[in-house]
């Protein structure tokens, strides 16, 4: 099933306004992960990071930043931030990782990619 937008001038103007000024459909495209993410970041944490971006209520920046710190054992502290439309939120989660990590999710308009900052 293919979705087609209405072609009226009023709708086009409103659509452009929403897309330009409200973040519109940023991160609403194909999603990819790098080999490093696939090998080192457990699937449950990958899904959590994507969902944090999906549920963000402020205007989204093309670059989403996640600092993941091991508190003890499998207890993690995840700080999600962005620079444009400043945003910062810290949560705790459970996951099995061996080291602290910095993860980016970048939207290039055609697709979104999750990758390590290093």
Where does each model-flagged region fall?
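N-terminal "domain-start" segment
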Residues: 2-93
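Short, compact, well-ordered microdomains
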Residues: 83-118
């Amino acid at each position: 099933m293919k979705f087609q937008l209405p072609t009226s001038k009023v709708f086009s103007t409103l659509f452009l306004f929403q897309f330009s000024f409200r973040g519109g459909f940023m991160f609403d495209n194909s999603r990819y992960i790098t080999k490093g993410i696939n090998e080192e970041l457990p699937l449950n944490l990958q899904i959590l990071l994507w969902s944090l971006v999906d549920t963000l209520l402020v205007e989204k920046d093309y670059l989403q930043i996640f600092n993941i710190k091991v508190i003890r054992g499998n207890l993690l502290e995840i700080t999600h931030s962005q620079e444009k439309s400043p945003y910062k939120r810290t949560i705790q989660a459970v996951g099995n990782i061996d080291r602290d990590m910095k993860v980016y999710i970048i939207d290039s308009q055609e697709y979104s990619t999750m990758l390590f900052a290093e």
